[in-house]
Curated annotation (Swiss-Prot):
Oligomer status and interactors: Component of the U1 snRNP particle, a subcomplex of the spliceosome.
Lineage: Eukaryota, Fungi, Dikarya, Ascomycota, Saccharomycotina
Transmembrane segments: none
Residue runs in coiled coils: 292-380
Region span, Disordered: 76-101, 484-505
Role according to the record: Component of the U1 snRNP particle, which recognizes and binds the 5'-splice site of pre-mRNA. Together with other non-snRNP factors, U1 snRNP forms the spliceosomal commitment complex, that targets pre-mRNA to the splicing pathway.
Keywords (A to Z) from UniProt: Coiled coil, Cytoplasm, mRNA processing, mRNA splicing, Nucleus, Ribonucleoprotein, RNA-binding, Spliceosome
Homology family: Belongs to the SNU71 family.
Biological processes annotated in GO: mRNA processing; RNA splicing
Regions of compositional bias (Acidic residues) in chain numbering: 88-99
MF annotations from Gene Ontology: RNA binding
Name of this protein: U1 small nuclear ribonucleoprotein component SNU71
GO CC annotation, single: spliceosomal complex
Protein location: Cytoplasm; Nucleus
Species annotation: Scheffersomyces stipitis (strain ATCC 58785 / CBS 6054 / NBRC 10063 / NRRL Y-11545) (Yeast)
Length: 579
C-alpha cells in the first residue's frame, strides 16, 4: 500500500543539476532572436526529471555531489571507450578494406619451365585458411622487400591450403628456406606447416663462384606480432562450407518419413490394399532417394580423392624435378649411367673429337640428301631441255622437207581469211534480213565443222597407232637380236626387211605395249606421270632394247630401287607379245 504524503511537507527537485556552461560552445554559434531581450546566460539549467523530497531536509549538497560524480564518470568512460576502440582498431582491423592481392597469379603460371624456376619455387603446406589478401600480407611480412609471385591450391572442404611462392632470384628462395623452415610453424600457430623446396638448390648455388648467400636472419618480433594480429581477426578467414552436398536429399527423406498419399489418387485401389500400396510407394521413393544420395556421396568422395591426387602430384613434381636436373648438362655434374659407362674412359680431347665426328656425320648426311634432290631435279630438267634442243635442231630440216605443205597451209589461211570476211558480211546481212535462212546456214556450217573435227580426230588416232606400230617393230627386232646365242650380226637385208614389218603388226599389240607402260608407271610411282612415260618411250625409240641399264639409271632418279623392277617387268612383257 502506497502512502500519499501531503503537499505541505514535500517538494519536488531535480536529482542533479546541469551547469550553465552545458552546450555553451554550441550556443555561441546561435544568434539571439532580434525581438528577444533574454540573454543566453540567463537561461536556467532545467532537468526534466523531478523527485519528491522533504522540505525539512537540505539536499543541495547531495545533489551537487551526484552531479559532480556523473560528470566525472561520463568523461572517464568516454576516454576509456575511445582508448578501447583505438586499441581494437589496431589489433583487430574489423573495418579494414579487402584489397586485391598484387602478387597473386594463377597456379598454371608457376609451372617450372627452367631450372631457375624449379629452384626458386617454395611451397608452404598446411597454410592457414585465410583469404587471399591476408595471405599476401603475411608473405609480405615474411619476405620483406624481396620480389615474388604466389598462388595456392585450395579445396572447398579443406581447412588448410598449400601456398606456392616463386621468388625472382634463387638466393631469395634459399634465404627464405634457411630462415623460416624451422620457425614458420610457430609463427603461423600450426605444427603441421611444412616448407618444401628443391634439394639441389645448395649444389647449384655452390657451383656459382660469384654467389654470396644472404646470411640467415632472425625473425623480428614485430613481424610475429603483425602476423598474429592478422590470424586473430576472424574476418580474415575463409568461410568453410560444412555442407556434405546431400542436404537436399536428406530433407526430402525427412519429408517422406511424414509423407501421406492423397486418398483421391487411390480411388481405383481396393480399400484392403491401400495401406500396403501406400507403404510400397513411400518405400520405393525413399529407396530411390537413398540410392541417389549414396551416388552423390561417392561422387563427392571421388572428387576429394582426385583433389588429393592432384596435390600429391604437385608435391611430387618438386621431387621429380631432381631427376630432370640430372638430365640438364648445363647445371649438373653427373650424367646418366649409360652415358657415363660409354664415355668414361675418354679424355677431354677424345670426347671433343667424338662430338666433332658426330656433327660431321650429320652434316654429311644432310649434304647427301640435298645433293640427291638436286641431281633428281637436274636430271628432269636435262631431259626436258634435251628434247627441246632436238626439236629446235630438226626444225629447219622439217621445214625444208615439208615446205610445200606449209606453203599450201599459208595459201589456205589467206583464202579462208578473205572468204571469212565475205562470209561474215553476208551472214550479218542475212541475220537482219532473213533470220530463218541464217539459222539454216549456221546449222549447216556447224554440222560440216563437226564432221571435219571428227575426221581430224580419226586421222590423228591412225597416225599415232602407226607410229606406235613402228616402235613396236623396232622393239621386236632388238629382242630377236638379244636372244641369239651366237655373235653373228643380223644381215642388213633382214633389217631392211624388218623395217617393212609395220604393215604386218597389229594395232592392238602396240596399244597393249603403251597401256603396259602406263600401268607399270602407275604401279611403281603411285600416279600416272606423263613425263616418265615419255622418257621410257624415248629410250625405247632411240635404243630399242639394247639400253636396258641406261633406262634403269634414268628411272632410278625417280623410282630408286623400283626402277630395276619396272624395267624387268617391261622387258618380260615385250618378250611375251613379240613371240
Amino acid at each position: 500500500m502506497v502512502a500519499i504524503l501531503p503537499d505541505s511537507i514535500t517538494a519536488e527537485t531535480a536529482p542533479y543539476f546541469l551547469p550553465e556552461s552545458n552546450n555553451s560552445k554550441l550556443l555561441e554559434f546561435l544568434k539571439p532572436l532580434p525581438f528577444s531581450t533574454i540573454k543566453s546566460q540567463s537561461i536556467p539549467a532545467v532537468v526534466g526529471t523531478q523527485v519528491p523530497v522533504f522540505k525539512s531536509i537540505d539536499v543541495s549538497n547531495l545533489i551537487e555531489k551526484t552531479s559532480n560524480r556523473l560528470i566525472w564518470q561520463t568523461a572517464s568512460e568516454r576516454r576509456r571507450d575511445d582508448a578501447r576502440s583505438t586499441s581494437e582498431e589496431l589489433e583487430n582491423p574489423e573495418n579494414e578494406i579487402e584489397e586485391d592481392p598484387q602478387h597473386f597469379v594463377e597456379i598454371q603460371e608457376l609451372l617450372p619451365k627452367s631450372l631457375k624456376d624449379q629452384l626458386s619455387l617454395v611451397v608452404v603446406d598446411n597454410f592457414p585458411n585465410v583469404k587471399q589478401y591476408a595471405i599476401e600480407k603475411i608473405v609480405d611480412s615474411l619476405v620483406d622487400t624481396r620480389k615474388y609471385k604466389w598462388s595456392h591450391v585450395h579445396y572447398e572442404f579443406a581447412d588448410n591450403r598449400s601456398v606456392y611462392i616463386r621468388f625472382e632470384h634463387v638466393p631469395d628462395a634459399k634465404w627464405f628456406v634457411d630462415t623460416y623452415s624451422s620457425v614458420l610453424p610457430d609463427i603461423l600457430s600450426n605444427k603441421n606447416i611444412k616448407v618444401i623446396h628443391n634439394n639441389h638448390i645448395d649444389e647449384v648455388l655452390d657451383e656459382l663462384s660469384d654467389f654470396k648467400a644472404d646470411p640467415k636472419s632472425t625473425v623480428n618480433s614485430k613481424v610475429v606480432s603483425k602476423i598474429g594480429s592478422i590470424l586473430k581477426n576472424k574476418r580474415n578467414f575463409e568461410r568453410i562450407s560444412k555442407r556434405s552436398g546431400t542436404e537436399d536429399l536428406d530433407e526430402v527423406l525427412a519429408y517422406y518419413s511424414k509423407y501421406e498419399v492423397d486418398s483421391n489418387d487411390l480411388i481405383d485401389v481396393p480399400t484392403n490394399m491401400r495401406e500396403a500400396i501406400v507403404k510400397d510407394i513411400v518405400r520405393f521413393r525413399s529407396k530411390v532417394l537413398l540410392i541417389e544420395r549414396d551416388n552423390r556421396k561417392k561422387e563427392i568422395e571421388l572428387e576429394r580423392e582426385k583433389t588429393k591426387d592432384r596435390l600429391k602430384k604437385l608435391f611430387a613434381g618438386l621431387k621429380e624435378t631432381n631427376d630432370d636436373i640430372n638430365m640438364d648438362s648445363e647445371t649438373t655434374k653427373d650424367l646418366p649411367s649409360n652415358i657415363v659407362n660409354e664415355y668414361d674412359d675418354l679424355s677431354d680431347d677424345e670426347y671433343e673429337e667424338l662430338l666433332k665426328t658426330g656433327e660431321k656425320k650429320k652434316l654429311d648426311k644432310l649434304y647427301q640428301d640435298k645433293s640427291h634432290q638436286l641431281q633428281s631435279l637436274e636430271t628432269r630438267e636435262r631431259l626436258y631441255l634435251t628434247k627441246k634442243l632436238e626439236d629446235l635442231n630438226n626444225y629447219e630440216d622439217d621445214l625444208i622437207n615439208n615446205k610445200i605443205k606449209y606453203i599450201e597451209d599459208f595459201k589456205n589461211i589467206e583464202e579462208s581469211t578473205n572468204s571469212n570476211n565475205n562470209d561474215i558480211s553476208s551472214l550479218v546481212s542475212l541475220y537482219f534480213n532473213n533470220h530463218a535462212q541464217y539459222l539454216k546456214v549456221r546449222n549447216h556450217k556447224r554440222s560440216a565443222e563437226e564432221a571435219l573435227d571428227a575426221k581430224d580426230e580419226d586421222d590423228e588416232k591412225k597416225e599415232e597407232l602407226s607410229t606406235k606400230s613402228q616402235d613396236f617393230v623396232s622393239l621386236k627386232k632388238a629382242k630377236n637380236t638379244l636372244e641369239k646365242d651366237t655373235e653373228d650380226a643380223v644381215p642388213v637385208a633382214d633389217n631392211a626387211e624388218s623395217e617393212t614389218e609395220p604393215s604386218r603388226i597389229e594395232v592392238d599389240q602396240t596399244s597393249k605395249l603403251q597401256s603396259k607402260i602406263v600401268e607399270l608407271v602407275e604401279e611403281y610411282l603411285g600416279i600416272v606421270d606423263e613425263f616418265l612415260v615419255e622418257v621410257i618411250n624415248e629410250n625405247l625409240n632411240k635404243h630399242n632394247l639394247s639400253a636396258k641399264d641406261e633406262l634403269m639409271e634414268e628411272l632410278s632418279e625417280v623410282l630408286d630401287d623400283d626402277s630395276a623392277n619396272l624395267v624387268n617387268d617391261l622387258w618380260n612383257y615385250v618378250s611375251t607379245i613379240a613371240i
